[in-house]
């Protein structure tokens, strides 16, 4: 296709080009993508976005050596990706905050459990800390993100009774943050 042609033209000029395919569908069809489109350098799923910089570096090194077969990273890593993502600073009155990923419902029409994995919720303490950062940057309205946010069940703040918190608990904690409306 067009990307292959662009890559070949750039390589003819001595310019490196790395093509990555990412997302849920890429995760589900990763091996097939590499097989059908050998010019694709990287295929990764949503759970491994945080590894993209090292995959690009690896693909770039492989291009120089000439024996590159494509990097396929579609597994569910042991470590949560939220620990590896850069901290976001709000640049306006509203901001988005990921609190949950995945789904355990397995509805017949949905691929989320297969491509995003089991439900995983961030700890309340981590969500509140990020929300405070967003509020200090000017965010007054914070939209909580996830595939199934109403199933949120994060670890409570240390020292509080009980071990897990539902969405209502999280919202009450976020409402206590100065500046958040």
Which residues does each predicted region cover?
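Proteins enriched for Cys/Gly/acidic motifs involved in redox and nucleic-acid/cofactor modification
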Residues: 1-153, 174
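Short glycine-enriched, charge-decorated loop/helix-capping segments at active-site entrances
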Residues: 117, 156-161
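Alpha-helix-loop-beta-strand connector modules within alpha/beta enzyme cores
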Residues: 161-181
């Amino acid at each position: 296709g067009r990307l292959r042609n662009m890559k070949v033209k750039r390589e003819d000029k001595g310019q490196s080009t790395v093509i990555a395919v990412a997302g849920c569908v890429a995760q589900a069809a990763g091996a097939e993508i590499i097989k059908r489109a050998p010019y694709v350098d990287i295929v990764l799923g949503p759970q491994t976005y945080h590894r993209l910089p090292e995959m690009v570096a690896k693909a770039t090194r492989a291009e120089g050596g000439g024996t590159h077969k494509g990097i396929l990273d579609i597994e569910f890593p042991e470590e949560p990706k939220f620990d590896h993502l850069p901290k976001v600073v709000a640049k306006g009155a509203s901001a988005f905050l990921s609190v949950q990923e995945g789904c355990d419902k397995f509805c017949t029409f949905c691929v989320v459990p297969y491509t995003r994995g089991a439900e995983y919720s961030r700890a309340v303490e981590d969500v509140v800390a990020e929300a405070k950062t967003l509020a200090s940057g000017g965010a007054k309205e914070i939209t909580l993100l996830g595939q199934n946010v109403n199933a949120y069940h994060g670890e409570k703040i240390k020292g509080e009774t009980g071990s897990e918190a539902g969405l209502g608990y999280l919202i009450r904690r976020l409402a206590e943050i100065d500046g958040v409306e």
